[in-house]
Amino acid sequence: MSEENKANEGLKYSYKYPHPSVTTDCVIFGFDGVKLKVLLVERGMAPYKGRWAFPGGFLNMDESAEEGALRELKEETGLEGAYIRQFHTFSAPQRDPRERVITIAYYALVTMQEVKGGDDASDARWFALDEVPPLAFDHDQILRKAEKTLRQQIHFEPVGFELLPEKFTIKQLQNLYEAILDM
């Protein structure tokens, strides 16, 4: 251990000023052939126990934001291997009633599969975008921003292909793009 590291060892996680917690939230889109859907988890703990939210949670001290997002997604839904993209950071001071929390939001497009609530999520379920219930925290705002980002992104990148089977028809592709652009 270097002399500098030895000198700083006692300072680990000691701060003069209060600091916020950091979380991640994952907006996961799927397509059932007709409608665009979003994956939600039912919160099993306060605050907002029983309300629907995006998979997510607090970062561990030894992980990156992306690692934390993927860990929470797996723990709360069983979903693994999603290619997630960061799209926005939400930092309103009162967004979480427990404490000052900043969340880094990710979105992903995945082939719909069976999911199951785990960890602090009592359930996990796919919802059509026009059937999303009122969400916990500021997740309604996060969903609107994710939809807007996806609609913009689809004009520049072939992002929709992750939602289609390996072999698909032009009609399936058209249905997908219409579903995304009409959200």
Ranges and model annotations:
Residues 175-183:
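Short helix-coil junctions and helix-kink-helix linkers
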Residues 55, 69, 73:
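Hydrophobic alpha-helical positions that pack around
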Residues 20-24, 66-70, 78-115, 123, ...:
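Active-site segment of metal-dependent pyrophosphate-handling enzymes
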Residues 1-6, 103:
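Non-catalytic substrate-recognition and accessory regions of acyl/acetyltransferase enzymes
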Residues 7-53, 66:
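N-terminal strand-loop-strand
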Residues 116-154, 163-176:
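NUDIX/MutT-family hydrolases
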Residues 38, 42-45, 49, 56, ...:
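Short, His- and charge-rich active-site/binding loops that engage polyanionic ligands
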